[in-house]
Design a protein with these regions (language model features):
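C-terminal structural segment of proteins
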Residues: 1-281
Length: 281
């Protein structure tokens, strides 16, 4: 029996990719690094007829850090490039740390910043940290561009708010970030995905706590975080915020842990993350 081989579209410019995106819409599955979609295809979870690969578009692989502007990371920048960037290491060490925890060097050399967000894979490391940093994604079509906060980009398991004619082209992180911390709780091997991920940061004088890998999207509750605004972040307050997060989240059960197990871990890891965040605005 002949294999069903999908048609490959391989533009070399962003304009060319957007033209193809406009023409094919949802009929074409977009491929960035290919780490996630490769698994889905090998397990026959999805069988796309058309693949639109972005790997040849060099203009989407960049890191730009200017003192008076947000940090900009192109969608086709690999996890490894973020991890090894001297600019990131000097000015955004929390990103160096977070991306270094993703799987293995082999995976990080292939997986991209845009891909991990557009895939909306709930068990990935970067989305929670980027959300805590108040990062914005940039979605572009042939005739428009818009910024989408991470918490609005990911809408459900493996689903985003990107339109059929749009591509995610970059991530922007505001310079108002002060202290930030990322905690990855693994229930299995050191290279495993998180059972519970907690990111916390002071951004523009306000606390942002985001819990990942426990539900369909990064879990962020501004009303709970507001308890810390203008307050000394004591152990008692950190414990209370952790307790409220555990109550507010409806965790999933999977091979990394049951819902009840995750709920207990959430309370502890949120408290620990807050105890690591030094200072307040």
């Amino acid at each position: 029996m002949a294999r069903n081989v999908p048609e490959w579209l391989a533009p070399t410019t962003l304009k060319g990719a957007l033209e193809l995106r406009a023409r094919y819409g949802d009929e074409a599955t977009v491929v960035a690094g290919g780490t996630f979609i490769g698994i889905l295809m090998s397990q026959k979870i999805i069988m796309p007829q058309v693949l639109l690969t972005l790997r040849h578009i060099r203009e989407l692989a960049f890191i730009e850090d200017q003192s008076d502007r947000p940090l900009r990371i192109g969608a086709m920048t690999t996890h490894r490039a973020v991890e090894r960037s001297a600019l990131i290491q000097q000015n955004w060490p929390i990103l160096t740390y977070t991306f270094s925890l993703v799987a293995s060097p082999r995976v990080r050399n292939q997986a991209t910043v845009g891909g991990v967000l557009a895939d909306a894979d709930y068990a990935s490391d970067p989305p929670a940290m980027l959300c805590a940093l108040n990062a914005r994604t940039v979605a572009r079509s042939l005739d428009s561009e818009r910024e989408i906060p991470i918490e609005e980009l990911i809408t459900d398991y493996y689903e985003t708010s990107l339109r059929p004619n749009e591509l995610l082209v970059e991530v922007r992180i505001p310079r108002s970030v002060k202290q930030a911390v990322y905690r990855k709780f693994r229930s299995r091997s050191s290279e495993d995905r998180p059972c519970v991920a907690v990111a916390a940061a002071w951004v523009g004088g306000k606390l942002r706590v985001v819990v990942g890998a426990v539900a369909e999207r990064p879990q962020y509750f501004p009303d709970i975080c507001s308890l810390a605004n203008g307050q000394q972040l004591s152990r008692e307050l950190a414990t209370e915020i952790g307790r409220r997060y555990a109550e507010a989240i409806n965790p999933i059960s999977d091979s990394r842990g049951s819902a009840e197990y995750r709920r207990r871990v959430i309370a502890v890891e949120v408290r620990r993350a807050l105890e690591e965040v030094v200072g307040h605005e």
